[in-house]
Amino acid sequence: MEETVAIGCVVKLDRGFPLVRLEDGAELRCKHATSLVKGERVRAVIGDRVRVSFAERNDKALIVEVLPRTRELVRKDPTERAVPQVLAANFDRIIVTQPSVEVNMRRLERELVLAHETGAAVSVVLTKADLAESEDEVERVRERVRALVGADV
């Protein structure tokens, strides 16, 4: 049986198994090659471009290489104090959402710091405006958020 190697993009993570969409549109459930996760613990995240190897006899393709990233959204790994955790890669814009009736300004600040560190364009979207008591209330919240983040709300 022949093995095929292709380039694709991670579009979903499901219980640690990336779903990779190939350039021809086909999707493959994958696992990471042992060589990737030993030592440096490089794991593909949503948005990563990866090289996969697959054979018809296997139920999962194998991610053999994570291609260089243009951007990363990184946070401290909650399980290990010193190790950063990459959440997403290779994006142009980050959209931070908060419900307009319950904006948590401290959380929004933390999310915006992480987002701005990537160098990507950042937007804030306030959701659930229909649950507010009045349009004036929504406008007051929008102004508070705009004072924090700028005009793109």
Description of each model-found segment:
Residues 1-105:
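N-terminal accessory targeting/assembly segments
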Residues 24-26, 78-79, 109-112, 138-141:
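Short, glycine/charged-enriched secondary-structure capping and boundary segments
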Residues 25, 58, 117, 148-150:
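Short, well-ordered coil/turn elements that cap or connect secondary structure elements
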Residues 47, 115, 127:
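Residue-level signal for inorganic ion chemistry
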Residues 96, 124-126:
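Structural beta-sheet core signal
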Residues 101, 129-130:
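Short, glycine/serine-rich, charged loops/turns that create anion-binding
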Residues 107-121:
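Histidine-anchored nucleotide/phosphate-binding helix
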Residues 121, 130-153:
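Canonical P-loop GTPase G-domain recognition
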